[in-house]
Each structure stands twice: as structure tokens, then as C-alpha cells.
């Protein structure tokens, strides 16, 4: 039995752990595990994270998602996120951000590739930064994203309003900063895209 499972059984009263065992076993993994279980989901634990099966999903097959717990004050580290995305498995990669009240907010993260587009007649980019050179070369219109609290807003040929907001990830940013960005993006119906070491990640709020 995994520590997370033992703590959850203790919480439900199935058996009792000692105070020392509780202190030893408590972790961010447990906080997210307990939250998912309380939502009625089937959760399995492995060394990568928490494998979650959507309701009515057969548990003998592929998990619906892998959930990676993150503390809201942690500085951002994408190592295990990229590791999961690069596996190419047919499951969502999610993070569960834990706040100071031990509540959890969930986000789905996807690797993103930009397809070719073109500028609308009479439109132009006002940004020429190296961070978005790829997008400019592919025909996207790039303008400042300051009014949305991000670095850039991005238009393709089909859009009258910017579908994407790009934020460049630099040292010192934590997961609370990301949660703020996604909240703003959700409120104005835009997808937040994180630019990190010449890679692109879209991030959206999700209800488990």
C-alpha cells in the first residue's frame, strides 16, 4: 500500500495511523490524491504521478490523465511535464496546484505547434522580439499583451480578436503566477500559451 493510500484509509477511519506515520506520509501527492478521491474518481499511484480514470472509464486500460501535484509557491519546473508529454500517450497531462488551504485547482497542459498562417491586409505585428520570431515567420500578428497581464497577444488570419496570450517563462515565476494568467485568459476567452526554452505549452483550467 502506498503512503497516500494509507493516509486516505486513515482519514476514512478504515484503520488508524500513528501521529508519526501521518507526519511522515503527508505530501502534496496525498493532498491531490485525497481531493480526486473525494470527487469520486478512481486514482492509481505510480512514480510518475497520479493516474486518473474518468467516470465510466475501464481501469484496465489507459488512464484518462496523469496528474502532477504542484504547490502554488513552488518556482516553475517543467521537467516532469515535458517528460509526460514526450511519452506521447493517449491521456491528458494535468497539474494540480495546491493552495495554502489545501484546495486544489486543476489545469490541462498540451504541447503546442503553430501552423502556417498569414497577416490580414492592412495588419502588422508591432513586436519583433526573438521569443516570437517563429510565429512572425509563420505569418502571425504579434502585439503587446500588457493589457491582459502577459507579454504578447497573437492573431492568425481568421481571428478578429486574439485567440492566444503568450507569457514567456523566466526565473522566479511560481505556479500562483500561472494560475493568475489562466484566470485572466479564461475570463476573456483566450488560451494562455507558455513560452519556455523555445517550446510552447498551452494551459487551460479543467474540472476533474
Predicted regions and their residues:
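Conserved phosphate-interacting/catalytic interface
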Residues: 1-143, 158-208
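Phosphate-end processing signature that detects enzymes handling 5′-triphosphorylated RNA
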Residues: 146
Amino acid at each position: 500500500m502506498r503512503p497516500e493510500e494509507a493516509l486516505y484509509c486513515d482519514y476514512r477511519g478504515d484503520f488508524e495511523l500513528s501521529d508519526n506515520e501521518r507526519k511522515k506520509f503527508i505530501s502534496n501527492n496525498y493532498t491531490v490524491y485525497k481531493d480526486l478521491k473525494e470527487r469520486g474518481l478512481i486514482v492509481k499511484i505510480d512514480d510518475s504521478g497520479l493516474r486518473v480514470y474518468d467516470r465510466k472509464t475501464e481501469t484496465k486500460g489507459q488512464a484518462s490523465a496523469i496528474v502532477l501535484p504542484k504547490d502554488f509557491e513552488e518556482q516553475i519546473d517543467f521537467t516532469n511535464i515535458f517528460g509526460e508529454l514526450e511519452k506521447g500517450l493517449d491521456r491528458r497531462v494535468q497539474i494540480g496546484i495546491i493552495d495554502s488551504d489545501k484546495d486544489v485547482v486543476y489545469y490541462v497542459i498540451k504541447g503546442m505547434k503553430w501552423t502556417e498562417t498569414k497577416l490580414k491586409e492592412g495588419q502588422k505585428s508591432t513586436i519583433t522580439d526573438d521569443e516570437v520570431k517563429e510565429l512572425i515567420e509563420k505569418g502571425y500578428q504579434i502585439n503587446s499583451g500588457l493589457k491582459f497581464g502577459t507579454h504578447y497577444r497573437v492573431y492568425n488570419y481568421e481571428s478578429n480578436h486574439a485567440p492566444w496570450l503568450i507569457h514567456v517563462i523566466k526565473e522566479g515565476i511560481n505556479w500562483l503566477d500561472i494560475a493568475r494568467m489562466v484566470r485572466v485568459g479564461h475570463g476573456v476567452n483566450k488560451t494562455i500559451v507558455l513560452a519556455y526554452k523555445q517550446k510552447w505549452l498551452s494551459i487551460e483550467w479543467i474540472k476533474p
